Amino acid sequence: MGVRLRVWPAAPHSISRCPRPLGAVLSILLAGGSRKGTPTARCLGQRTKEKRVGGRSLRSEAGSGPCPTAGAQPTAPSSAWPPRLRPRTCPQMSGELPRVRPTRVGLSSLGSGPGHPPSGTRMCGERARNRRGRARRLTPEQPRIGASAGPGPPLPPARPRCSGSCHLPRPPQHLSPPQPGRVRMGAAEGSRRADTHHARRRRRARLPAPRSAST
């Protein structure tokens, strides 16, 4: 069974560094190769590595865009393919001109370094400054409600609840001893008390039941 060998012309990227005639290479291949330590084996190993690297470079260029001819350079250095992408960094940190005009607060914070945020803002992860049950500190522009309000009328003292079934409020009792000139007024007040609705109901309950006309 014969073995057919096909030889392609050497490409410019696959030219080995150690020049060997084509006949010597074919004789080495037909003879079954040589040892790894010989210079011919080294040249063959370098040649296969260069072929692999050249094939990868050609594939990457073919996938990325139009591939110029071997050994040819682009006409202008600025029109290199593919174009270089700039890193996505903050324009303030990289020194480039920002696309959006920053506010005055932002410029002041950039100039002064890590400063405090403006009043009224709450940072992420920050707890509430005022907990429940604690009074907030008043600003000098915020007046106190108690100081601005005028003195109102005095509140009447709370009357104690009477014990028992009486639901009507009792008149205030005089703690001072009774005077002789006010005895008649007290009797008049007693007669008025007896004429209340509650007293009338009590009287009706005490009276005997009316007899029926049939008896």
UniProtKB/Swiss-Prot annotation:
> Predominant location of this chain?
nucleus
According to the record, what induces this protein's expression? Up-regulated after serum withdrawal.
Q: In which tissues is it expressed?
A: Widely expressed.
Compartment list: Nucleus, Nucleolus
Q: Which UniProt keywords apply?
A: Apoptosis, Nucleus, Tumor suppressor
Q: Where in the sequence does UniProt note compositional bias of the Pro residues kind?
A: 169-180
The segment annotated Necessary for nucleolar localization runs over: 185-215
Which stretches does the entry tag as region Disordered? 35-215
One of the GO biological process terms:
regulation of protein stability
What do the Gene Ontology cellular component annotations say? Answer: nucleolus
Q: Does the keyword Aminoacyl-tRNA synthetase apply?
A: no
Q: What does this protein do?
A: Apoptosis-inducing protein that modulates the tumor suppressor function of CDKN2A/p14ARF. Enhances the stability of CDKN2A/p14ARF protein by protecting it from degradation. May act as a tumor suppressor.
Q: What is this protein called?
A: Proapoptotic nucleolar protein 1
Q: What's the gene?
A: PANO1
